[in-house]
Amino acid sequence: MAAEAAAAQEVHSAAELQQPGTPSDAQENRKKLESLREQLASTPYVGAAMVVLSVFMPWISLGRMFDVTIMDISKGLMLAIIFIGAASAYAILKKKNYVLSAAMGHALLIFAVVAFIRYQSLLSEVKKTIFGAMASSAISLEWGGLLFLGGALNLCVVSVFLYTIEQLLPQGGALAGDVLFRTWKELVRAKVKLASIEVPAWCYSLVMGILLVMLFLQSGMNRMMH
């Protein structure tokens, strides 16, 4: 899906909210920000790689005898996850489109939350059976799901950090937790452009997340959980 993002004009930038103290402080802050930006330069590759690799790794293990992967249960879901993960990293590295990359990362997180809730629901249903305790102990989460969650968080966090750095560099503002939080809210409220229309980034994330959930609900894993 081709999409471009534009930050909301009405929201104050983090740079405006965090003014530098003295010229020497501003210069020192710029050095720290530039150093951090260099350190984060390759991080989106790591996040995207974690998301992509997760679809080939087990998410759930049944009695250590049968492993379930995204690739096995739904090719459509597998391709969608790979596309979103790669597109998010591309938006960060090539387009510097942090609104879009964060929105895609949030969509992956929405899917991760729903998948985990479904997993917990499965355990609750299994425990109600005659051999519930034994059966539920045989079902466990595997590295695939954790790798996916880590990759999605990586893409979201890096988007927030890099966008904050871009906002703070001109004035040499200091990087702080409250600034990062305000930047995150700004990214969520910003606009994502789809063709000729613009939608809030949170709405874009919700729609993409729902699409992933729908693919999951049609997958073999969900049928197996019933």
Over which residues does each language-model region extend?
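Cys/His-rich metal-coordination motifs, chiefly Zn-binding "fingers/knuckles"
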Residues: M1-S13
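Cationic, low-complexity basic patches in intrinsically disordered or flexible, solvent-exposed regions
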Residues: Q19-P20
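Compact integral membrane and secretory-pathway proteins
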Residues: P23-H226
